[in-house]
Structures are given as C-alpha cells and as structure tokens.
A protein has these predicted regions:
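HotDog/MaoC-like acyl-thioester-processing domains
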Residues: 43-44, 55-122
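Hot-dog-fold acyl-thioester-processing enzymes
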Residues: 1-25, 102-122
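Generic structural detector for well-ordered beta-strands
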Residues: 1, 37, 92-96
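Generic structural signal for well-ordered secondary structure
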Residues: 12, 27-32, 59-62
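Residues that recognize and position ribonucleotide moieties
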Residues: 9, 28, 86
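Hydrophobic beta-strand-centered segment that forms part of the acyl-chain substrate-binding groove
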Residues: 16-49
Length: 122
C-alpha cells in the first residue's frame, strides 16, 4: 500500500521538480507547511502520477496545489468521467526559497536534541 508519508514525499518531489529549473544558482527551497488529503488506497505496484501547480507567489513564499492520480494498469477500467475515482490524494505544499549555503550554515549552528520516542514505542 502507498502510505501517507510516501504520498507526501511524491507530492513534495513534484513541487521541487517544477521549481528547480527556475531557481538561481545556490538557491533552494524548504518546506514550511503541508495540507494533504489521502483519498484512496493504492495497492503495491500501483502507478501514481503527481501534478503540481504554483498557485501563489509572495516574495520568497511559494504555494503549490497538487493532485496524485492512479495511471497505467492501476487506472484500467475507469471511464474518463470517473477521474475522481483515480485520485489517490490532493493538497497543497508551501515552500520558501532560501540561499542553500546560508541555510545549511544556520542549521549547523543549532544544537541537536534527541527526538523523543512516541508513547508506546519500545
């Protein structure tokens, strides 16, 4: 099954891929906010295609809308008017454009802290 974290990773990858060719050298983007609706189960081996569209640009802030659909064999048997049945997930991703070196330098200065285990995890 396609888990929600993997669906989010695919969505972020689509946003990054659409943005990267437009960034100046030395610049990158970092995620700041995500809204994700996981709408449909996707069996192992299902082909998923994610489309991302820039919907807002405000200074360094970019907001993308994305939709993840079943394609290929996992979409077989659905008529064109059944598009909603093929949607595995949809949502939005907000990213901020940053200078890569400055961002990494600031991150390296932050003290690292252990991440606490969630309750019930041995």
């Amino acid at each position: 099954m396609l888990g929600t974290p993997r669906l989010l990773a695919l969505a972020e990858a689509a946003c990054i891929a659409s943005l990267e060719p437009h960034l100046d050298p030395g610049m990158t983007s970092v995620g700041t906010r995500v809204a994700l609706e996981h709408r449909r189960a996707s069996p192992v081996g299902a082909e998923i295609e994610v489309e991302a569209e820039l919907t807002e640009l405000a200074g360094r802030k970019l907001v993308f809308a994305f939709i993840a659909r079943h394609v290929g064999p996992s979409a077989a048997g659905y008529a064109p008017d059944q598009d909603e049945e093929l949607v595995a997930g949809a949502g939005s991703v907000e990213r901020i454009v940053v200078d890569r070196d400055k961002f990494l330098a600031r991150a390296a200065l932050r003290p690292s802290r252990p991440v606490p285990e969630p309750p019930g995890v041995p």
